[in-house]
Amino acid sequence: MNARLSTPMNSRIPSQNLAHQAKTKRMVQLALMISIIFVMAFSPLGYLRTPGLTITFLTVPVAVGAVLMGPLAGAVCGLAFGITSLITAMTGGSPFSSMLLSINPLALAFTCLVPRVLEGWLCGLIFAALRPRFKNASYFIACLACPLLNTVLFMSSLILFFYNTDYVQGLAASLGASHPLIFVILFVGIQGAIEAAACTVLGSAVSRTLAAALKR
């Protein structure tokens, strides 16, 4: 009788171990993605800087994390991206962000963090929604959505909090923009197109390769 009673308990032990291993594996993978984001952010790998443009590739690991591990992981990767942007502003790595920090620190913190969290979360949701019906295209669409969401959400927050400041009004005047939408188009311009193309190509290629390797 004791043997019979112990059998169900013993059968649960392997499943509990497997669940623990899966959780640990997932946390390790997420930690790796966050580490990649920080390494890229503070090295030449994360940005292509030219006299007129600063193009970021940090949307690539955010998109890969969202695609491989889901919306929550995407949000965490987006948060890591936002934290690096805030650190860059605080350390003077970006003159534009540093100026916004001096104008309104709380608004800049919101602008750096919240759009990036939403970017990763929404990217994961888009992939999860499309994957059952569009197995291959879902990688492409999700990785395209990530930089587009980053641009739209970041610029929306920028317009909301900073458009009426003297600094941004000066930038708008220098670009010849008399309307917020025109300012966004001129301000983002070719930079946004390059970021979208890079994330779409690199993100979809990396995520599909890793998904196949991880059998997902």
Task: State each model region's role.
Residues M1-R216:
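Loop-helix junctions at membrane interfaces
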